[in-house]
Amino acid sequence: VLYDIHGNKADVQEDIAAATLAAVRCPIASQPLQKVVRKGDKVAVIVSDVTRLVRTAEFLPVIISEINAAGVPDEDITIIVATGTHRAHTHDEDIAVCGKDIVKRIKIHQHDSRNNEELTDLGVTSFGTPILIDSYVAEADKVIITGAVSLHPMAGFGGGRKAVMPGVSGHATIMHNHAIALAPKVGDGCNPLCETGLLEGNPLHEDMVEV
């Protein structure tokens, strides 16, 4: 054994719903969710697809309830499954991710990165990446991102902006962004700035943020 690595201890959240409610009512550096959305808004809620281990079904009902409490009815809410380049969910997978009650109540849209008719062109990043975003997201008045923060071998960390890029981005956007993980010179392997746990100076991460 070369190293014995110990992480910082953290309290285990036994009640995910209660923790979620506390977070959306008293968030860090933001207004409470009920003050962010308002009656008349079209709200898009992005959720991770079935390939990601996220306990969405335990916290999503709380988020939907808070949106409702702000005056936004179910019919003005769309859940976007952030498939990236993955396939669409089956109905059973939607239930596994979102929960049976939410699937019955709320419209669920499966992102398709290759369907250009469902993408909105928002320009180009400073890295030259075309910004093609799912139109349900681009045209929403408010967008709520959910997901898990985790280590990522190219982007530094997963979560946050990755729900949008690659989650609900076009295929061309994803391919151009991910190519940044390769060294600028052909044959030199991977870009040394794109590595696990590194955000500052990581061009792949910075491009994602621009998207």
Short names for language-model regions:
Residues L53-V72:
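Histidine-anchored nucleotide/phosphate-binding helix
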